[in-house]
Amino acid sequence: MEQIKRKYDKILVVNLEVNMKKKIIGVTPRINKTDSATFVRVHRNYIDKLTKLDLVPIIITPGSDLNTVLPLCDGFLIIGGDDYDPVMYNENNDQNESKEINPDMDKLDTDILNYATKNKIPVMGICRGHQAMSACFGKALYQDIESNHLEHPHDGIYHEVTKVNNFGLGKELPDKFITNTYHHQATKDLPDGFVVLYKNHDVIEAIEHETLPIIATQWHPERMDTKESDIIFNYFEKLIMNNSK
């Protein structure tokens, strides 16, 4: 029995050593509350895209010991989810345009971005994660695309995006291509240092930082099995692999 235990311990240590050689990606979740329970979830599409690249995702939840967890991560993925509290960018929600606000998630995203920018850790933002690049730094969002009369034509859940800057990720993607549409809010103002890569008429659809390893898309590339989606996630992996943490 003791021999079996020693063998098991050895296997466990070897597995841990192998896994620690892989790059770890901290992933934010969605929080869903019912009358009887709170659910923390991440859609499998996000996980599948990361593991396909041999990256190791770990879910970071509100209340986590960030001083312990964040230094473990070689990159961060801020996923889609609820709307940010407009108080973050000095606006109110009198018209109830921002929905299902979760202050705990707002704080978590802000803490992660502050850590990542300070330590130059790669970040990819998707949908809400794209809007995080503004809201978490006090820059405004359009709380509702329709009520702000933004031109944002789409056919069902799909629309076309057009390149406006041939920078970074933009150099690897075509001038125009079709993406999905699952959002009712959009970026209004960006912090200094961000370059707009793609737009759909009035709506900013993809951005990248000039000097920090940060990219973000308003659409959901993890939900699309296209060459463009593969390029985006491969580019994120390249940012991670090239980063000297």
Question: Predicted regions: what is each one?
Answer:
Residues M1-I126, K139-Y142, E146-L173, K188-V195, ...:
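N-terminal beta1-alpha1 cap of cysteine-dependent amidohydrolase-like domains
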Residues D111, Q131, Q185:
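Active-site phosphate/pyrophosphate-handling residues
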Residues G125, G129, S134:
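Gly/Ala-rich beta-loop-alpha elbow adjacent to hydrolase catalytic centers
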Residues G129, H183, V203:
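A generic "binding-loop/recognition-motif" signal
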Residues N180-H184, L190:
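Internal anion-binding site segments
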Residues I215-W219:
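Active-site-proximal beta-strand elements of phosphoester/diester hydrolases
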